[in-house]
Amino acid sequence: MHGRHVTLKDIVLDLQPPDPVGLHCYEQLVDSSEDEVDEVDGQDSQPLKQHFQIVTCCCGCDSNVRLVVQCTETDIREVQQLLLGTLNIVCPICAPKT
């Protein structure tokens, strides 16, 4: 359009229909929430193992004995209960004597 007044000559209509575009998507999405649940369950099935240092006394000579174990927190609690009970640790010097 040129000028201040609109005339019919200035209006151009393009009456061709637009190209049809298929908006349907035929892909099937995998439900990712199932994978996330499996990962969380997988972590729960194998608890995290850590290193724990145990310092105790030899039952033969009362010298300090240091152990480093790798286990879960639940397992280290069981070791603690055993050490408080009847389990005794023997140092390498006293081991051949018993």
Curated annotation (Swiss-Prot):
Alphabetical keyword list: Activator, DNA-binding, Early protein, G1/S host cell cycle checkpoint dysregulation by virus, Host cytoplasm, Host nucleus, Host-virus interaction, Inhibition of host innate immune response by virus, Inhibition of host interferon signaling pathway by virus, Interferon antiviral system evasion, Metal-binding, Modulation of host cell cycle by virus, Oncogene, Transcription, Transcription regulation, Viral immunoevasion, Zinc, Zinc-finger
Short motif (LXCXE motif): ranges: 23-27
Short sequence motif named Nuclear export signal, residue ranges: 76-84
Gene3D superfamilies in the cross-refs: 3.30.160.330
Main localization, broad class: host cell
Region (E7 terminal domain): 1-42
Keyword Iron: no
GO biological process: DNA-templated transcription; symbiont-mediated perturbation of host cell cycle G1/S transition checkpoint; symbiont-mediated suppression of host innate immune response; symbiont-mediated suppression of host type I interferon-mediated signaling pathway
Source domain of life: Viruses
Protein modification: Highly phosphorylated.
Record has Lipoprotein as a keyword: no
GO molecular function: DNA binding; DNA-binding transcription factor activity; protein domain specific binding; zinc ion binding
ZnF endpoints (unnamed): 58-94
A Pfam family per the record: E7
GO CC terms in record: host cell cytoplasm; host cell nucleus
Entry text on domains: The E7 terminal domain is an intrinsically disordered domain, whose flexibility and conformational transitions confer target adaptability to the oncoprotein. It allows adaptation to a variety of protein targets and exposes the PEST degradation sequence that regulates its turnover in the cell.
Stated role: Plays a role in viral genome replication by driving entry of quiescent cells into the cell cycle. Stimulation of progression from G1 to S phase allows the virus to efficiently use the cellular DNA replicating machinery to achieve viral genome replication. E7 protein has both transforming and trans-activating activities. Induces the disassembly of the E2F1 transcription factor from RB1, with subsequent transcriptional activation of E2F1-regulated S-phase genes. Interferes with host histone deacetylation mediated by HDAC1 and HDAC2, leading to transcription activation.
Assembly mode: Homodimer. Homooligomer. Interacts with host RB1; this interaction induces dissociation of RB1-E2F1 complex thereby disrupting RB1 activity. Interacts with host EP300; this interaction represses EP300 transcriptional activity. Interacts with protein E2; this interaction inhibits E7 oncogenic activity. Interacts with host TMEM173/STING; this interaction impairs the ability of TMEM173/STING to sense cytosolic DNA and promote the production of type I interferon (IFN-alpha and IFN-beta).
Protein name (record): Protein E7
Gene: E7
